[in-house]
């Protein structure tokens, strides 16, 4: 897993309180990790803060899995 992927995983574990081994690229925030819509908004905000970038609403709606978040942030992260 890339450095960005590891940082994404850490944020997901902290925010959702899930076991680290469950946080894999294919894991859906809602279906596999038990997030609700508020959790997903909070995750997006945490990603924005951690990586110093803005995630527009239309992009946020396409980030459904850990892998989706990692791919988006690898392209758009500032730090």
From Swiss-Prot:
Listed pathway(s): Lipid metabolism; fatty acid biosynthesis
GO biological process: lipid A biosynthetic process
Molecular function as annotated in GO: acyl binding; acyl carrier activity; phosphopantetheine binding
Keyword terms: Cytoplasm, Fatty acid biosynthesis, Fatty acid metabolism, Lipid biosynthesis, Lipid metabolism, Phosphopantetheine, Phosphoprotein
One Pfam family in the UniProt entry: PP-binding
Annotated Gene Ontology cellular component terms: cytosol; membrane
Localization: Cytoplasm
SUPFAM superfamilies the UniProt entry points to: ACP-like
Start and end residues of each Carrier domain: 2-77
List of residues that carry O-(pantetheine 4'-phosphoryl)serine: 37
Transmembrane segments: none
InterPro entries assigned to the protein according to its UniProt record, in alphabetical order: ACP, ACP-like_sf, PKS_PP-bd, PP-bd_ACP, Ppantetheine_attach_site
Modification(s) after translation: 4'-phosphopantetheine is transferred from CoA to a specific serine of apo-ACP by AcpS. This modification is essential for activity because fatty acids are bound in thioester linkage to the sulfhydryl of the prosthetic group.
SMART domains with a match to the protein in the record: PKS_PP
Family to which the UniProt record says this protein belongs: Belongs to the acyl carrier protein (ACP) family.
Function according to Swiss-Prot or TrEMBL: Carrier of the growing fatty acid chain in fatty acid biosynthesis.
NCBIfam families from the UniProt entry: acyl_carrier, PRK00982.1-2, PRK00982.1-3, PRK00982.1-4, PRK00982.1-5
Name of this protein: Acyl carrier protein
Species the sequence originates in: Nitrobacter winogradskyi (strain ATCC 25391 / DSM 10237 / CIP 104748 / NCIMB 11846 / Nb-255)
Gene, per the UniProt record: acpP
């Amino acid at each position: 897993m890339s450095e960005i992927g590891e940082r994404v995983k850490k944020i997901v574990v902290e925010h959702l309180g899930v076991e680290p081994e469950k946080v894999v690229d294919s894991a859906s925030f809602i279906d596999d990790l038990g997030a609700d819509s508020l959790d997903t908004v909070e995750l997006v905000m945490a990603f924005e803060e951690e990586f110093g970038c803005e995630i527009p609403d239309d992009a946020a709606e396409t980030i459904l899995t850990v892998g989706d978040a990692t791919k988006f942030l690898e392209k758009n992260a500032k730090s």
